Amino acid sequence: MSAVLFKRLVFQVGDSANERTFTLSSVSKNGHFISLRPFTKPTEDEKKFPLEWVFAGTNDRVKVTPTTNADGKPVLQQDFDMGFDTNVYLNVENTHRGVINTFWQNWESGCVEETGKVFPFGNDKEGIPFMELWQPIDPNSKDLVILDAGDGRKIDGPVRSTVLKVVDGQDFEGLMIIVGEWAQGYLADKNKSSVDGLSFVRYHVSNEKLSSGLFEYGSQLSKFPTDFSNVKEGSLLTIDGLKWEVIEN
């Protein structure tokens, strides 16, 4: 598979559809993933933690199975067992825990529909269906350029796919994924379970370095890698005392 970048257009739970976030999901060539979902206009109560949700994981945390829906159309079943989930980290009440079964179907427009069901009150209780509509984005453009199946727009050139993971055995866990010119990452302090232990970044990458910051949150931003000019798969970086390993490049 090739690395992809998606922007969420619509989020629907039950009969209510809305979109309050600037959500981007990055998926590396090898299937590592992160979804960063900051609010565009957080309320006063939300400003302390201005994100709807963040989750991430390595490719061993998702199972992908081609299948068909009830109409016989091809869909992709993706079963996520999140390696990291802000709702679980923060111990948010009525949070789904465990695998989330999702189904992905391509629309003629080029958009991708994701449907599924979560069980925030327990697997033995009634589930809540949801739908998310995703727009593929050109990861090689620093502008938000859509990939439209209607006009046949193609990505210009190969797509960079670099993934760095915090080395086990430290006080933090974290993942950073670069797809094309877009970088997203998270850090979580294992010794905390509050918003004070979380840090997130979304950046453009230019000339092998993080350039313009699109979103930043948290007190540990200095621990994120910023220079990728000499990274090779398997190499180790130490950033402000934190060790990262390049697990894909």
UniProtKB/Swiss-Prot annotation:
It holds the Pfam family HRI1. Transmembrane segments: none annotated. GO terms for cellular component: endoplasmic reticulum membrane; fungal biofilm matrix; nucleus. One of its GO terms (biological process) is protein targeting to membrane. It is found in: Cytoplasm; Nucleus. InterPro entries: Hri1 (IPR031818), Hri1_N (IPR038744), Hri1_N_sf (IPR043047). Its main location: cytoplasm. The keyword Cytoplasm applies. Keywords: Cytoplasm, Nucleus. This is Protein HRI1. The gene is HRI1.
